[in-house]
C-alpha cells in the first residue's frame, strides 16, 4: 500500500486542533466553576471571621476585669489555703504558665531578688569579656549593708563578684558589676529594663542593680510576682548562660581575692531552700523596709520545673514566712500538676489549588494538595491538672491560586487551655503546584498526539 505523508500530517494536525479546542472548552468550564467555588469559599471565610469576632466581643464584654478572669480560671477548691505573702505566683517553668497566683499583677518593691537580673546580664556580658575587671568607685564602696567591704580603687574580676552578689547579696558588688559593664548604674538600669521588656515583663521598673528602695521619674523600683517569676524563668530556662547561672547560685562556698591579690574574701550561700526540698534548683532572697521579705526560687523534680515568686512575705520578726510559703506552693505544684501527652501532629484537610497545572493531567485546572504542621513533634507534653483538658482549633485557607510553593503558610493549629492559648503551630503546604498556562497545556497535548506510537497506529489502521 502506498503511503501518503501529506495525508498523515493533515489528519494529525486536524486531530490536534479538535482536541485542543475541546480541551480549551473543558478548561474554561472548570475555570469558571473554580472561580465561583473560590468566591464562595472566601465569602464563607469572611462570615466565619465576623461571627468569631462577635463571639469574642461578647466574651470580652462579659469579663469585668482581667484579674477576676485570671483568678476564675485557677480556682479548683484545693489551692494553698493561707499564704503569708501579699503577692505570690507558682509558675510552670517549661511553658511559662501561671499555675497559681495571689495578687500576681500587683506592683510591689522587690528588694534583692533584683540581683537575678543583674547576675544574668553580667553572665551574658562575660561571654564576650570573660576576664573583665572593674576598679571600685566611690559610689560602689559607699553602699550600705549587706556589703563585701570593698574599698575605692580596688580592682576585682567581675566573675568573682557574681558569687559575692548571689551568695551573700552584697550591695557594693552589685554596683561595681553594673559600673563595670555599662559605665554607670543609670546605664545599667536601662539594660535591665530593656531585658525585662524582652522577656515579657509588663509591670517591672529597675532603678538599682542591688534592689535597694529607690524612685525616679519612671516610678519606684518594683515588679510583680508574675514578672519576677518570668525573670527567673529566663535565667534558668532560656538564657544562653542558664547553666552558668545555676552553677553560681547553687555554689555553697566561694573564696576569691582582689585582682592584686592583697585581700581574700569568702562567701557562703544563704539560700536555705537549696537544702529544704529535694530538687531545689536555684533562688534569691531579698529584704528592705519597703519590700519586706521577698523570694524567688525554682525546683526540678520528675522532669517538672516549678518557679515560686513571693513579694511582701512578712517583716521582722517573720523571716521564716518565705520558706513556709515556698514549700507550700512547691508541694501544691508537685501534687496536682503532671505532664500529659497531647497529640500535636494533626493533619488538617487538604487545600484546593485553582489554576493548577499537572503535566500528567493537562485538562485539569485544579487539584487538592496535602497540608502538614510545620516542625511538629509526634506529641507535646504539657503540665496539667487531672481535670484540665486541651482544646485544639484548626484554621486553614480552603483555596489558593497557583503557583503555590512547598512549605507556604496555609493556616494554624492552636491549642487552648480554657480560654488561654498555650501553643500554636503553623500549617504549610506539602508540595509545590505550578500555575496553569495555555502554552503549557498545548505543549503537553501536542506531545501526546505527535508520539511515534500514534503515527504508527494511524498509518496501520487508517
Task: Give, region by region, the residue ranges found by the protein language model.
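Active-site-adjacent loops and short helices of periplasmic peptidoglycan-processing enzymes
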Residues: 31-240
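Gram-positive cell-envelope targeting signals
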Residues: 1-46, 51, 446-462
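Intrinsically disordered, low-complexity segments enriched in small/polar residues
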Residues: 18-20, 43, 50, 60, ...
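Structural motif marking the loop-to-transmembrane transition
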Residues: 5-9, 158, 438
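Domain-terminus/edge residues, biased toward the C-terminal soluble/receptor-binding domains
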Residues: 27, 219-462
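Compositionally biased non-globular segments, especially hydrophobic aliphatic-rich helices
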Residues: 22, 27, 41-47, 59, ...
Amino acid at each position: 500500500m502506498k503511503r501518503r505523508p501529506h495525508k498523515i500530517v493533515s489528519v494529525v494536525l486536524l486531530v490536534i486542533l479538535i482536541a485542543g479546542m475541546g480541551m480549551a472548552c473543558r478548561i474554561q468550564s472548570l475555570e469558571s466553576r473554580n472561580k465561583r467555588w473560590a468566591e464562595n469559599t472566601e465569602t464563607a471565610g469572611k462570615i466565619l471571621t465576623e461571627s468569631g469576632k462577635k463571639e469574642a466581643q461578647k466574651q470580652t464584654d462579659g469579663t469585668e476585669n482581667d484579674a477576676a478572669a485570671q483568678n476564675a480560671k485557677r480556682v479548683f477548691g484545693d489551692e494553698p489555703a493561707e499564704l503569708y505573702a501579699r503577692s505570690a505566683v507558682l509558675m510552670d517553668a517549661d511553658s511559662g504558665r501561671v499555675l497559681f497566683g495571689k495578687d500576681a499583677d500587683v506592683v510591689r518593691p522587690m528588694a534583692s531578688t533584683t540581683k537575678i537580673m543583674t547576675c544574668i546580664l553580667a553572665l551574658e556580658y562575660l561571654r564576650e569579656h570573660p576576664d573583665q575587671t572593674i576598679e571600685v568607685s566611690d559610689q560602689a564602696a559607699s553602699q550600705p549593708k549587706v556589703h563585701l567591704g570593698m574599698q575605692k580603687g580596688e580592682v576585682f574580676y567581675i566573675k568573682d563578684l557574681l558569687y559575692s552578689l548571689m551568695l551573700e547579696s552584697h550591695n557594693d558588688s552589685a554596683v561595681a558589676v553594673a559600673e563595670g559593664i555599662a559605665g554607670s548604674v543609670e546605664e545599667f538600669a536601662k539594660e535591665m529594663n530593656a531585658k525585662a521588656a524582652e522577656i515579657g515583663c509588663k509591670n517591672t521598673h529597675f532603678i538599682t542593680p542591688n534592689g535597694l528602695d529607690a524612685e525616679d521619674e519612671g516610678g519606684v523600683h518594683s515588679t510583680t510576682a508574675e514578672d519576677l517569676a518570668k525573670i527567673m524563668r529566663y535565667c534558668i530556662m532560656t538564657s544562653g548562660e542558664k547553666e552558668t547561672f545555676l552553677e553560681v547560685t547553687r555554689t555553697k562556698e566561694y573564696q576569691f581575692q582582689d585582682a592584686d591579690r592583697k585581700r581574700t574574701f569568702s562567701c557562703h550561700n544563704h539560700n536555705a531552700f537549696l537544702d529544704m526540698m529535694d530538687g531545689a534548683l536555684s533562688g534569691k532572697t531579698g529584704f528592705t523596709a519597703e519590700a519586706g521579705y521577698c523570694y524567688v526560687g525554682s525546683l526540678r523534680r520528675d522532669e517538672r520545673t516549678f518557679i515560686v515568686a513571693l513579694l511582701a512575705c512578712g517583716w521582722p520578726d517573720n523571716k521564716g514566712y518565705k520558706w513556709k510559703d515556698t514549700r507550700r506552693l512547691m508541694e501544691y505544684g508537685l501534687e496536682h500538676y503532671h505532664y500529659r501527652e497531647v497529640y500535636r501532629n494533626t493533619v488538617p484537610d487538604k487545600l484546593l489549588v485553582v489554576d493548577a497545572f499537572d503535566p500528567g493531567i493537562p485538562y485539569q485546572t485544579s487539584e487538592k494538595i496535602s497540608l502538614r504542621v510545620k516542625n511538629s513533634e509526634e506529641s507535646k507534653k504539657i503540665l496539667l491538672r487531672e481535670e484540665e483538658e486541651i482544646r485544639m482549633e484548626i484554621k486553614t485557607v480552603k483555596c489558593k491560586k497557583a503557583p503555590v510553593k512547598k512549605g507556604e503558610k496555609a493556616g494554624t493549629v492552636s491549642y487552648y487551655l480554657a480560654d488561654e492559648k498555650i501553643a500554636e503551630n503553623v500549617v504549610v503546604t506539602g508540595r509545590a503546584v505550578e500555575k496553569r498556562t495555555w502554552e503549557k497545556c498545548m505543549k503537553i497535548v501536542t506531545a501526546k498526539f505527535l508520539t511515534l506510537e500514534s503515527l504508527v497506529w494511524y498509518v496501520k489502521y487508517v
